[in-house]
Amino acid sequence: MSVVITIDGPSGSGKGTICRLIAEASGFELLDSGALYRLTALATVEQGANSADEQQVAGIAASLDIKFIPQEGSTQVMLAGKDVTKAIRAEEIGMLASTVAAYPAVRQALLDRQRAFLTAKGLVADGRDMGTVVFPAAPLKIFLTASAQERANRRVKQLEQAGVASINYEQILSDIEKRDEQDRNRATAPLLPADDAVMLDSTALSIDEVKQQILGLAKARQLF
């Protein structure tokens, strides 16, 4: 039987990094569901489509030509044969991704696509509704959080490491708080922990401490 570990949580909580580390440690496949919504947002912009037209955006989501290529310490994301790993991480694409993710037709278009990532090898799934909607029967569900201030600090460090010259902490914090509000209050698949999820606050924890806690939970459940 295929095993899936879901890790849900708000933007900037460290889901992506932790999921990659858990996948490496377990030998499981990796699903970055947030990237699918960011890819949909980017493709919508690049095609000059109307982002307010739910059916048009859903059509784009259904026909995405995407590929995830594992790299040392990261994952390369390809859209129609083009490397968009950095492009999908732009703040404006993240905000638009949150908007299009609220469309039921878009979520439905991507649902089967996400479930298809689960193979006999096992899967670590990163997102906002992995444990509640996409993989509700997962034997281990994590809801990873951190304070908005800590998540803004992490984003600032990411941008500094990427060589971004002009960084506005207050704007980044405001964007995170707006996105949290959007994600929590959308009508379809709002950002909420599954009833049986393990709540894990990473505000005062290192990446390795979070990783070890999750690996401990997985091993206690004999998932690998």
From Swiss-Prot:
Sample GO molecular function, one term: dCMP kinase activity
Keyword DNA-binding among record annotations: no
Cellular compartment(s): Cytoplasm
Pfam families assigned: Cytidylate_kin
Keywords annotated in UniProt: ATP-binding, Cytoplasm, Kinase, Nucleotide-binding, Transferase
Binding-site list for ATP: 9-17
GO CC annotations, alphabetized: cytosol
Stored InterPro entries: Cytidylate_kin, Cytidylate_kinase_dom, P-loop_NTPase
Organism domain of life: Bacteria
EC number: 2.7.4.25
Coarse class of the protein's main subcellular location: cytoplasm
Annotated Gene3D superfamilies: P-loop containing nucleotide triphosphate hydrolases
Biological process, per Gene Ontology: nucleobase-containing small molecule interconversion; pyrimidine nucleotide metabolic process
Secretion signal span: none
Catalytic reaction equation(s): CMP + ATP = CDP + ADP; dCMP + ATP = dCDP + ADP
Listed NCBIfam families: cmk
HAMAP family with a match to the protein in the record: Cytidyl_kinase_type1
Family named by the database record: Belongs to the cytidylate kinase family. Type 1 subfamily.
Protein name: Cytidylate kinase
UniProt source species: Saccharophagus degradans (strain 2-40 / ATCC 43961 / DSM 17024)
Gene: cmk
